[in-house]
A protein has these predicted regions:
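C-terminal capping/lid segments that line or modulate ligand- or cofactor-binding pockets
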Residues: 19-40, 75-141
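Extended ligand-binding clefts on enzyme/binding-domain cores
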Residues: 1-80
Length: 141
């Protein structure tokens, strides 16, 4: 699709041409290069990431201290989004956030408050903790 003269990957498109600009932390569009769908330098990909991280996107939390992506299910920054960012090369951004957040007493949770970093949903989210550990390891290798 295209918006404001900039092509982007839509989350979904219907037969009438309606589309959604959206991202879901458990299955992020940021992973498209990791699945060899496109290059991380691809203009369409970069436009897409810019759109889902912009202050105009409802779940970006771009102007918050914990500026990661959320979704309607848990409308706060997700730890899975932080892990996604690590795997996509945003290591310093993530390091700064990890130093600020307490999550669920240091255990990964589903989402955190965008200002305080305290757990808002999904306490002791084991699969998220595993994915976060994997992402940290991959990002630091």
């Amino acid at each position: 699709k295209e918006q404001n003269g900039r092509p982007f990957f839509a989350w979904s498109v219907d037969l009438n041409g309606h589309f959604d600009i959206y991202d879901e932390p458990p299955g992020s569009l940021q992973f498209l290069p990791l699945f060899d769908f496109c290059s991380p330098t691809d203009e369409i990909y970069r436009n897409t990431v810019a759109m889902i991280r912009s202050p105009e996107y409802k779940y970006s939390f771009a102007n918050s201290p914990i500026n990661e992506i959320g979704c309607p299910h848990a409308p706060h920054p997700w730890i899975l989004s932080l892990a996604n960012s690590l795997l996509c090369g945003r290591v310093e951004h993530c390091r700064a956030i990890l130093e600020k957040i307490s999550m669920d007493n240091g255990i990964a949770c589903e989402s955190v408050d965008e200002v305080t970093g305290y757990c808002t949903t999904g306490e002791a989210f084991a699969t998220c903790a595993g994915f976060l550990c994997h992402s940290i390891r991959e990002a630091l290798l």
